[in-house]
Design a protein with these regions (language model features):
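Conserved G1/Walker A P-loop phosphate-binding module
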Residues: 1-120, 126, 133, 144-145, ...
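C-terminal-of-GTPase-core extension/linker across diverse P-loop GTPases
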Residues: 2-6, 11, 17, 145, ...
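Helix N-terminus capping/helix-initiation residues
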Residues: 45-46, 124, 187, 254
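Short, conserved glycine- and acidic-residue-centered signature motifs
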Residues: 81, 137, 221
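Glycine-rich, flexible loop segments associated with nucleotide phosphate handling
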Residues: 121-129, 210, 224
Length: 277
């Protein structure tokens, strides 16, 4: 399983990746500090596997692993190649699912940028999610148009391709209305046709709501987190609250220290453990 970690610049994406993999990717307060994707492979925590290993003492224990890819931050216009858009979209296409890191904290020392990377704007989770959604959808529209073109030419020699033209034409209208391919309603046969196009907005998505320490302590009282929850619920996506800064500290602790730290916070497992699982 390969998960692509995406997000606008300065939302805490690389800090979160560092905590997940301890890979030490540069994390700085300026856009595009992640230009080439950093890749880390992480073992999935599994208490059952730990128990079996303790019981039977095998020569080798091989846990399930997840590959995380820290993908370059993007800005509005990525689907047209602005910023690092082309790299961003190509890297996402190679992933099985998307982890979208959304900024849910205020910090006057960290710029919040969307389109103009020199302009600081108010924190807006809904707007941030919308920027990335639209860029993926616009890229998908171009892909769908090419599929329609190809199917129309093929249909001249084989009428079975007419169904592809119909399906992709309906999907194009859906995408042009600002909807993701994930939310397009169709039967299994049509879903198989669409799946073959490997569309970006068809990929499963998990929202990692990045909070500050105060917000993480009671995420459901955080107004930004509530916005992310509501948007995720509309498409049946999962939301995991994290505090990237805190998770980076936790990642440096050994097993017993980590447990004590989490106990002090009053939580059973870190946001990263939930994300990796």
């Amino acid at each position: 399983m390969k998960l692509g970690i995406v997000g606008l610049p300065n939302v805490g994406k690389s800090t979160l990746f560092n905590a997940i993999t301890n890979a030490g990717a540069e994390s700085a307060n300026y856009p595009f500090c992640t230009i080439d994707p950093n890749v880390g492979v992480v073992a999935v925590p599994d208490h059952r596997l730990d128990a079996l290993t303790e019981m039977y003492h095998p020569k080798k224990t091989t846990p399930a692993v997840v590959e995380f890819v820290d993908i370059a931050g993007l800005v509005k216009g990525a689907s047209k190649g602005q910023g690092l858009g082309n790299k961003f979209l190509a890297n996402i296409r190679e992933c099985d699912a998307i982890v979208h890191v959304v900024r849910c904290f205020d910090d006057e020392n960290i710029m919040h940028v969307v389109a103009d990377t020199s302009t600081n704007v108010p924190v807006d989770p809904a707007g941030d999610i919308g920027v990335i959604d639209i860029e993926l959808i616009m890229a998908d529209v171009e892909m769908v148009e090419r599929r329609i073109d190809k199917a129309q030419k093929a249909a001249k020699g084989d009428k079975k391709y007419l169904r592809e033209v119909e399906v992709f034409s309906a999907l194009k209208d859906w995408l042009n209305d600002g909807n993701s391919a994930r939310s397009f309603d169709c039967d299994e046969d049509d879903a198989a046709i669409i799946a073959a196009a490997e569309l970006l907005s068809l990929k499963p998505i998990i929202y990692a709501a990045n909070l500050d320490e105060e917000g993480f302590a009671d995420c459901h009282a955080n107004a930004y987190y509530k916005v992310v929850e509501e948007l995720a619920a509309k498409e049946g996506a999962q939301v995991i609250p994290v505090c990237a800064k805190l998770e980076a500290e936790i990642a440096e602790l050994d097993g017993e220290e980590k447990k004590m730290f989490l106990d002090d916070l009053g939580i059973a497992e870190s946001g990263l453990d939930r994300l990796i699982k």
